[in-house]
Design a protein with these regions (language model features):
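Mixed-charge (Asp/Glu-Lys/Arg
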Residues: 1-171
Length: 171
């Protein structure tokens, strides 16, 4: 799991989604307005993936409702994904979806995800692009405090034990 909780409100959920996408190498924008054929719409998280050719576009809808998201909301999002020409649509809900919602997105590029499913979808990429490099950076910072080649000799010397001739000259 990347993040424990989806946040306390919908704005927090949007920011957490954008953070995960950014850590995966995407370029997210929170609350972006898009002009479509039917008018201007507000997209919770708009992201492009510069690692693909051409860059893929992801549109995310984030709901932190107490109830399950109804089918009509999912239908409206699916239409926005189609009108925008996005490659992927992720509808992320903290409390799931009503049963008919899944039929609306069948055979489309729209994915209905709870918070855990969204994280699982990006977990491998997040580990590869963010977590492992972060661990390497931490390890590199600690490397100056560790001398694996001479540590055994340094311990013996600190305890007053005699050093072998090669150790005495640092070989």
């Amino acid at each position: 799991m990347i993040e424990e909780q989806p946040g306390v409100n919908w704005q927090d959920l949007q920011l957490r989604v954008a953070t995960i996408l950014r850590e995966c190498g995407l370029l997210p924008e929170v609350s972006r307005s898009l002009r479509l054929a039917r008018g201007t719409v507000e997209i919770d998280v708009y992201a492009t993936d510069p690692t693909t050719t051409p860059p893929a576009v992801y549109l995310c809808e984030c709901k932190r409702w107490r109830s399950r998201v109804p089918q009509a909301e999912v239908q409206a999002f699916r239409t926005r994904i189609s009108d925008a020409g996005a490659h992927f649509g992720f509808f992320i809900s903290a409390n799931g979806f009503q049963s008919g919602a899944f039929e609306v997105v069948e055979h489309t590029n729209v994915h209905l995800l709870d918070w855990q499913e969204f994280q699982n979808l990006f977990l491998e990429r997040w580990c590869r692009t963010y977590w492992i490099p972060s661990l390497r950076t931490c390890g590199d910072r600690l490397a100056g405090y560790v001398d694996p080649a001479g540590s055994d000799a340094a311990i013996r010397e600190a305890h007053g034990e005699p050093l072998k001739p090669a150790e005495a000259v640092g070989l």
